[in-house]
């Protein structure tokens, strides 16, 4: 099955998408209350709309990584002179070369071949916190066809990576949003 990337992730004027920005902001209260002056990695940033909102809320710098080149091009156009960089990268293979205050992965881990491997690699580069948005069924455990229906316990990954669950809230459509802070 091939994904149709002609549609955007975010619904925008003149470009249909699958999600509304306002819906995708649900459950991100902690992130926005704590982003000021922080560096942020947005893994799987789509068109960069949440990255843009983080920069507007005072993030020092936001680095986005997205698989779809058209989305990266649009994100770089939309960001203007905000402190945001966006690059093309496949989160199955891409690894951060530096540390960030906060790492976010919003609706990305369950789409990967090895969510636990990627979660551990990203957590290793987070100085203060990691925010995950996961499907509602069984979170923080992921079981998805894209990872061969194996169970991937993101909670255990975060615990062994030196984080504790600070809060878990519901996002749009009951998605699980977990905020992990460094112990």
Which role does the model predict for each range below?
Residues 1-97, 106, 117, 169, ...:
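Conserved N-terminal segment of class I S-adenosyl-L-methionine
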Residues 38, 101, 128:
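Conserved acidic residues
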Residues 102-114:
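A short SAM/SAH-binding and catalytic strip from SAM-dependent methyltransferases
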Residues 122-126:
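Short, conserved loop/helix-junction motifs that constitute active-site signature segments
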Residues 127-139:
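Conserved beta-strand signature within the Rossmann-like core of class I S-adenosyl-L-methionine
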Residues 146-161:
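Short alpha-helix
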Residues 162-170:
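Short secondary-structure junctions
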Residues 180-183:
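Active-site beta-strand termini and strand-to-loop segments that position acidic
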């Amino acid at each position: 099955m091939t994904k149709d990337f002609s549609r955007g992730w975010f619904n925008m004027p003149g470009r249909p998408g699958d999600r509304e920005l306002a819906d995708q902001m649900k459950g991100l209260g902690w992130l926005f209350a704590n982003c000021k002056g922080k560096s942020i990695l947005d893994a799987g940033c789509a068109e960069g709309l949440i990255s843009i909102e983080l920069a507007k809320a005072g993030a020092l710098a936001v680095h986005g990584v997205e698989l779809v080149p058209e989305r990266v091009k649009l994100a770089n156009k939309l960001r203007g002179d905000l402190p945001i960089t966006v690059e093309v990268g496949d989160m199955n293979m891409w690894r951060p070369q530096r540390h960030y205050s906060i790492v976010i992965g919003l609706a990305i881990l369950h789409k990967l071949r090895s969510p636990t491997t990627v979660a551990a690699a990203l957590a290793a580069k987070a100085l203060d916190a990691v925010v995950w948005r996961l499907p509602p069924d069984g979170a923080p455990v992921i079981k998805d066809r894209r990872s061969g229906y194996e169970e991937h316990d993101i909670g255990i990954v975060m615990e062994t990576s030196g984080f504790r669950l600070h809060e878990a809230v519901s996002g749009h459509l009951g998605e699980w949003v977990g905020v992990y802070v460094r112990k």
